[in-house]
From Swiss-Prot:
The gene is rcnR. GO terms for cellular component: cytoplasm; protein-DNA complex. The lineage of its organism: Bacteria, Pseudomonadati, Pseudomonadota, Gammaproteobacteria, Enterobacterales. Its main location: cytoplasm. Pfam families: Trns_repr_metal. Belongs to the FrmR/RcnR family. Keywords: Cytoplasm, DNA-binding, Repressor, Transcription, Transcription regulation. One of its GO terms (molecular function) is transcription cis-regulatory region binding. Repressor of rcnA expression. Acts by binding specifically to the rcnA promoter in the absence of nickel and cobalt. In the presence of one of these metals, it has a weaker affinity for rcnA promoter. This is Transcriptional repressor RcnR. The keyword Nucleotide-binding does not apply.
């Protein structure tokens, strides 16, 4: 079973939190708010997205790299995660 399926409830809870934070940000932009409050909300969203990314990467590394017995498949999976990390860090 894929780690994203096994951890589905936890990951969905994180995405719901992110969704709520984005909705709150949109509401903040519709009404007058201090720039600092808007920036704080954006930082909170970024932190939540980073947390989600960390959990999915951790699951991927554990399942597809550490516990992968097929060396060729492990190399393929490593290439995939490295490309994702490159695009995420840009």
């Amino acid at each position: 079973m894929s780690h994203t399926i096994r951890d589905k409830q936890k990951l969905k809870a994180r995405t719901s939190k992110i969704q709520g934070q984005v909705i709150a940000l949109k509401k903040m932009l519709d009404e007058p708010h201090e720039c600092a409050a808007v920036l704080q909300q954006i930082a909170a969203i970024r932190g939540a997205v980073n947390g989600l990314m960390r959990e999915v990467i951790k699951g991927h590394l554990t399942e597809h790299i550490v516990h992968q017995s097929d060396e060729a498949r492990r190399e393929e999976d490593l290439d995939v995660i490295l490309k994702v990390l490159d695009s995420y860090i840009k």
